């Protein structure tokens, strides 16, 4: 339990940590250290700290307390201190010396008590499509009781917070961030959990059918080369359909695309060995891509 949480709020805060852990444990919502959640009480907001994982909520100290009002004022005044939000940490309650997430400022401008931001794979997939406005409107029409809006892509940090601040006063229940992810907000943990379930169902996308990969053959191909066969079966689908390959190699679509895979995904040429591919890259002074499609 975080220090500074009133006894009467302990159950709600524990529920918040449990929700954070659930979101962090779902690969279709959170990948690695991505995403963040927040809980506001008495002018203080507990938000996921930089570099921590939602999946560790409740097991490790990952929430850092910040003062909401001065942070919001700084953001609206275009004060550079709003970017990292470290000046607004409640030091007396920050026993682990954690630093706020770079996205702390947008959590602060949203008035709801509980806010969950995560990198929903399906929300991202729909938000990068041509005609995304109509596609999303048709999907969200299934949830007429939820107020929702879209937010254009902006760099995480104050640029994104400025855009969210434009719509925050309308108290949106759901914000779909183009090329980034989703935000779900509410007054209670259970309200947010229910909304997440509803939005997840509404935005669900069927996977494109592909043939099966051959891990044994891939293992033979990479012998002597600086690559390993992906352990996740789903990852192989990227290479098993022409449309998937076109999307994967067509450029970066969202921040985590670059964080996890870099700016380039390699494709093995017809008749080319993996070893020859690696040697050619090395001879040209090029870094090895983090993913090679065969």
Regions found by a protein language model. Give the residues of each.
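Glycine-rich flexible loops
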Residues: 1-294
């Amino acid at each position: 339990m975080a220090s500074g949480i009133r006894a009467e709020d302990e159950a709600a805060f524990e529920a918040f940590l449990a929700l954070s852990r659930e979101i962090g444990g779902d690969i279709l919502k959170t990948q690695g250290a991505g995403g963040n959640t927040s809980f506001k009480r008495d002018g203080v907001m507990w938000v996921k700290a930089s570099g921590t994982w939602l999946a560790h909520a409740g097991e490790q100290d990952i929430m850092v307390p910040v003062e909401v009002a001065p942070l919001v004022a700084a953001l609206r005044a275009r004060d550079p201190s709003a970017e990292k939000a470290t000046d607004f940490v409640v030091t007396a309650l920050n026993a682990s010396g954690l630093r706020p997430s770079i996205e702390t400022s947008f959590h602060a401008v949203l008035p709801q008590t509980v806010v969950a931001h995560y990198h929903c794979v399906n929300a991202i997939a729909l938000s990068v499509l041509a005609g995304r406005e109509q596609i999303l409107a048709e999907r969200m029409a299934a949830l007429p009781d939820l107020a929702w809006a879209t937010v254009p892509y902006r760099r995480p940090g104050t640029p994104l917070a400025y855009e969210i601040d434009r719509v925050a006063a309308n108290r949106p229940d759901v914000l779909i961030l183009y090329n980034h992810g989703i935000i779900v907000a509410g007054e209670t943990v259970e309200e947010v959990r229910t909304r997440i379930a509803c939005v997840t169902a509404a935005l669900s996308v069927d996977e494109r059918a592909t043939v099966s990969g051959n891990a044994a053959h891939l293992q033979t191909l990479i012998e002597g080369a600086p690559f390993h066969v992906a352990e996740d079966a789903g990852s192989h689908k990227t290479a098993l359909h022409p449309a998937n390959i076109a999307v994967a190699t067509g450029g970066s679509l969202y921040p985590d695309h670059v964080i996890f895979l870099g700016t380039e995904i390699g494709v093995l040429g017809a008749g080319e060995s993996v070893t020859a591919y690696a040697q050619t890259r090395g001879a040209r002074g090029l870094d090895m891509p983090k993913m090679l499609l065969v």
